[in-house]
Regions:
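Helix-centered, glycine/charged polyanion-binding patches within enzymatic domains
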Residues: 178-223
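Catalytic domains of lipid- and phosphate-ester/thioester hydrolases
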Residues: 1-23, 27-30, 41-46, 174-177, ...
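Short, basic, helix/turn surface patches
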Residues: 55-68, 205-220, 255-256
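Short, hinge-like loop/turn segments at secondary-structure boundaries
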Residues: 48-51, 196-201, 240-241
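Alpha-helical membrane-targeting segments
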Residues: 65-89, 189-208, 267-276
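Active-site-adjacent alpha/beta core region of enzyme catalytic domains
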Residues: 71-189, 221-223, 228-229, 233-260
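Patatin-like phospholipase
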Residues: 1-4, 9-94, 98, 130-139, ...
Length: 280
């Protein structure tokens, strides 16, 4: 089977917990598609970096982490100062960390087929990367618009893959017909907005949530993180929680995952790509 690993900041470390459970259960992984934090998890696992704490240490940027701790006035001041800049934060330290983590590794050389999803900043189109430096593909897939600068890639400006599709189910299907989608989204808010800005942000989130739900319909099985409370994108102190929660959710659905893994492809005719007609 292939896994579609969705974005979610620090919640993305749950993917490594899920993959650990599948490996322990002897379930073969035929492909990994990742978007944003899911891209980091997919590449890390495929190239043998399975310890979430070591991965986190490689990419941790104190400046980015401080965005969460900044008070509203300080954050607002930074936003206004960034209006004339390309992004709120620099990615130089993150890029260096990714280079140290992945070295010269390239997507096409991965032991597990990889599909890293980013988005074209100008068109919003999903861009699935199958070749190129792993570190740069992850950087592009996680470039949150406004927060991080876009990444130039073959004449395009690429940003966070979540802009196009939060959980890259279609990219995973292109790797292998049987797909387990792992959604690490926060639960929807249960309180009404208090300001006009909050209302605008909530409306955008609601729209993206609906698009995500439509994408998840293409998966054969959906594994949702369902955290007990909202976990901030950059709340790195929650890493142990999300990792163990990922393990727990995978264990809860292990029988279903095993059943899907054993299902023969010929029993899934609606999922297989049509074969070209034989010559007469």
């Amino acid at each position: 089977m292939a896994l579609a690993l969705g974005g979610g900041g620090v919640r993305g470390y749950a993917h490594l917990g899920v993959l650990w459970v599948l490996e322990e259960a002897g379930i073969p992984i035929r492909g990994l598609a990742g978007s944003s934090a899911g891209a980091l998890a997919a590449c890390a696992w495929a190239f043998g970096h399975k310890d979430p704490w070591k991965v986190h240490q490689a990419v941790f940027d104190k400046e980015v982490a401080n965005l969460r701790r900044a008070g509203n006035l300080r954050l607002l001041a930074r936003l206004f100062s960034a209006l004339r800049r390309q992004a709120l934060a620099d990615t130089a330290k993150v890029a260096e960390g990714l280079k140290r983590l992945f070295g010269e590794a390239r997507l096409e050389d991965s032991p597990i087929p990889l599909a890293i999803q980013a988005a074209d900043l100008l068109t919003g189109e999903a861009v699935v990367l199958r070749q190129g430096p792993a570190w740069k593909a992850v950087l592009a897939s996680a470039a949150i618009p406004g927060l991080f600068p876009p990444v130039a890639w073959e004449g395009r400006l690429l940003v966070d893959g979540d802009v196009a599709e939060k959980v890259p189910v279609r990219a995973a299907k292109a790797l292998f017909p049987k797909v387990v989608a792992v959604d690490v989204s926060n639960p929807p808010p249960n309180e009404p907005p208090k300001t006009a800005l909050e209302a605008v942000l909530l409306a955008g989130e609601a729209s993206r949530r609906r698009l995500k739900e439509l994408a998840l319909q293409g998966a054969d099985l959906v594994l949702s993180l369902d955290p007990p409370f909202p976990i901030d994108t950059f709340d790195h102190e929650k890493l142990p929680l999300v990792y163990t929660l990922g393990q727990k959710r995978a264990q809860e659905k292990l029988r279903e995952i095993q059943a899907l893994s054993r299902l023969r492809l010929k029993d899934l005719p609606h999922l297989l790509a049509p074969r070209p007609p034989r010559p007469a």
